[in-house]
Amino acid sequence: SDLLCTDTGINLFAPGKNPKGNMLFLTFLVNALMMVYKNQDLLRASIMSASNSYRLGANEAPPAILSCFLGSQLSSTLDEIVRQVGNEKMTPEEKTTLKLGIGRIPEILLDTTDRNRTSPFAFTGNRFEFRAAGSSSNCAASMIAINAAMANQLNEFRASVEKLMEEGVGKDEAIFRILKETIIASEPI
């Protein structure tokens, strides 16, 4: 399992209790998708061995192709962000509508019981599971690769948000715009 927590133990992949907490959750969720998308080769290299190469994609799940599974409800929430966030300044009504949708995430995830076993990188309610490592393998290399790639992705995300803020875009709107760009860019994964 791949948890990402703060120094005070807050799980950043757990939905929040309010729209602000869910904005944090969505930010880390979307950045995890982009991290996998940009670093597929690194992640594959981190779990590679002769026996694991033979196992992946053979008669066992998961396949050798890295993909992410979120579940239909969470995927539709990301689709809503893409649909609702434009490139122009958002009206207060648009922001409210978007934040109300984000506020429903804990309700959505409580109903999601589907645990897709065929995806090597699946979201299971409050964490991602990286299922590509072999059962007898030491997962240290893959954890180092995931954490380093995630740190790099978060730095890139922050820089993009700060750039928009320097151009006069408000913080929440800048985050929404970069979330939208990141969702679209990482969609193939």
Predicted feature locations:
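Active-site capping/gating regions of soluble enzymes
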Residues: 1-189
